[in-house]
């Protein structure tokens, strides 16, 4: 049987489309990313005001999912204008040199009904580490809602240098908490 080039191309494109998850459009108004940490042993939750997420997800084929997130490091809002400027400086995020923190998934696996196990690379301040975390996914108002929390050690990413390496003031443990709403 002879297959012409355009027929072969159409067949290959059809296979490629079947083998990927659907790209979703994130809803920034209904999405949040925040850093949760302790300062002088007092819990603080500080939102990042600017971030973007790209999610390819099909509930019927979760293992084909992909996700990436970029966070504007200078957009962390710790609740006080002077402190917001401080965390953008060199000792903390060094936002002038490293304006973005990012996460790119390498594998997303089903972990039961409404649960996913995510593995990927987290990059903050030019330092990258492999990370894994669970997340939940549910349908809400015709959209998918992805929620999770990723615990990290801030010093592994050089966030808090100089006098700020002292973890008695700001704990080394930080949880990146997120809720991303996305739909077609």
What are these regions (language model features)?
Residues 20-184:
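Low-complexity, acidic/polar, glycine-enriched regions of mature
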